[in-house]
């Protein structure tokens, strides 16, 4: 997607709400009225209809008319709409916000600790990435959605890996975590990934990892960095990018880029999808969207796709996560009803229906929801996206963590991780100079 930029991240946090919602969902009683939502427009046919159905069910029970506008993310229209509504102080009651947009608009959003803490009480721990993006100065300002939220693990052609790299990915990561062999899983490291990528490159089927300024590029590179222990800036605002860990990760990225298609530096978020669907590529790092499109456009490719965990680095196994959030504008006249609706659509049964409607693309932020049958049953082949939810030792990550959100938002939106790699690999700049440049960029983020 296009990068969303601004001069400054807004600084003011809204006051906290102390009330904690009871564990079970209990509908409220509201005066007749309307509740309007501006929602991310899903790319999966029928997914919007399922969300509309859930909202209408709640509306009929509570005698509230629910109006939904589905807003495309093409050209960042959803973010531009949110920015316009925040400035005008008028618009929808509830708005969806991608990546760092909760932080951007936090002083215009109602604190919703009661909703999120109630869900945590029901379902247990929530994604650390969701907390990093939406819990600001101790208070939740957004509810993680099921709709559109995603992680970006490996999606690989298991036939090509077996033929040309000698790896049976379905044997390493079968569609049943109980059957995983720890020794085989532990052997799936970045060194193993590189060795297989080199063989696939020689065979004429390179992996396709973008290195532009799109979110897909930033997310996979950030997961690589995290697995090597790279820290851009710590929570105390100390710049840490000049480290042995950074140099190790950059060298691995350099080696991977050497066996990648040369045009990956210009790819947008659709580039890696097109690469896999074309049949030319052996693998990407992405949600199962490419597989879903291939089912129609190139069935032979889809039949040989297998989603599985990311490679492991010296500091662990990490996968990029990109949640979407619901936020309630402070100007909303029906905030109580808005909170109740968000609680309803966040229930496990609601999430189950939404995941099914998206063929497993949508990923809730609660690990307690990772047992849905959809990931076990969608095909072809059966089990192809079972490993899409993080399982085993795979942890979610977000670029910039644990730096202060105002810094990480700029780091993400300006694609600092991929620009670093591009300077080093495509630009042939010296590694020390690239790291020095990145440190200067981080200093600049602190001043804005």
Task: Mark where each language-model region is.
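Paired acidic/hydrophobic, glycine-rich loop segments that form the ligand-binding mouth/hinge
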Residues: 93-96, 282-286
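Hinge/lid segment of periplasmic solute-binding proteins
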Residues: 98-155, 159-162, 304-311, 379-387, ...
């Amino acid at each position: 997607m296009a990068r969303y930029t601004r001069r400054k991240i807004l600084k003011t946090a809204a006051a906290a709400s102390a009330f904690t919602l009871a564990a079970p969902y209990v509908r409220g009683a509201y005066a007749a009225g309307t509740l309007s939502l501006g929602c991310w427009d899903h790319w999966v046919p029928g997914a919007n209809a399922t969300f509309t159905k859930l909202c209408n069910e709640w509306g009929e029970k509570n005698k509230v008319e629910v109006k939904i506008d589905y807003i495309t993310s093409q050209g960042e229209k959803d973010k531009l709409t949110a920015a316009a509504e925040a400035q005008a102080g008028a618009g929808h009651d509830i708005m969806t916000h991608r990546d760092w947009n909760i932080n951007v608009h936090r002083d215009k959003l109602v604190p919703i600790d009661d909703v999120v803490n109630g869900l945590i009480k029901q379902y247990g721990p929530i994604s650390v990435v969701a907390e990093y993006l939406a819990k600001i100065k101790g208070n939740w300002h957004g509810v993680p959605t099921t709709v559109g939220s995603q992680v970006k693990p490996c999606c690989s052609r298991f036939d090509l890996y077996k033929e040309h790299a000698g790896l049976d990915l379905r044997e390493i990561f079968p569609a049943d975590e109980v059957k995983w062999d720890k020794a085989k899983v532990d052997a799936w490291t970045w060194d193993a990934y590189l060795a297989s990528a080199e063989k696939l490159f020689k065979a004429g089927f390179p992996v396709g990892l973008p290195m532009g300024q799109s979110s897909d590029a930033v997310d996979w590179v950030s997961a690589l960095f995290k697995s090597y222990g790279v820290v851009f800036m710590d929570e105390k605002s100390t710049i840490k990018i000049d480290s042995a860990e950074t140099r190790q990760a950059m060298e691995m990225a350099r080696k991977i880029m050497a066996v990648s298609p040369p045009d990956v530096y210009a790819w947008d978020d659709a580039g890696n999808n097109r690469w896999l669907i074309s049949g030319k590529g052996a693998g990407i790092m992405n949600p199962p969207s490419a597989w879903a499109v291939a089912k129609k456009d190139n069935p032979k490719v889809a039949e040989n796709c297998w989603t599985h965990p990311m490679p492991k680095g010296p500091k662990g196994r990490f996968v990029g996560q990109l949640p979407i959030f619901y936020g309630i504008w402070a100007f909303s006249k029906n905030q109580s009803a808005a909170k109740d609706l968000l609680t309803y659509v966040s229930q496990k049964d609601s999430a189950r229906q939404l995941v099914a409607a998206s063929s497993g693309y949508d990923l809730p932020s609660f690990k307690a929801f990772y047992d849905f049958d959809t990931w076990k049953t969608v095909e072809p082949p059966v089990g192809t996206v079972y490993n899409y939810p993080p399982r085993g030792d795979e942890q979610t990550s977000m670029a910039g963590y644990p730096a202060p959100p105002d810094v990480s938002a700029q780091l993400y939106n300006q694609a600092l991780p991929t620009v670093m790699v591009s300077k080093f690999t495509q630009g042939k700049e010296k590694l020390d100079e690239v790291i020095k440049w990145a440190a200067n960029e981080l200093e600049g983020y602190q001043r804005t």
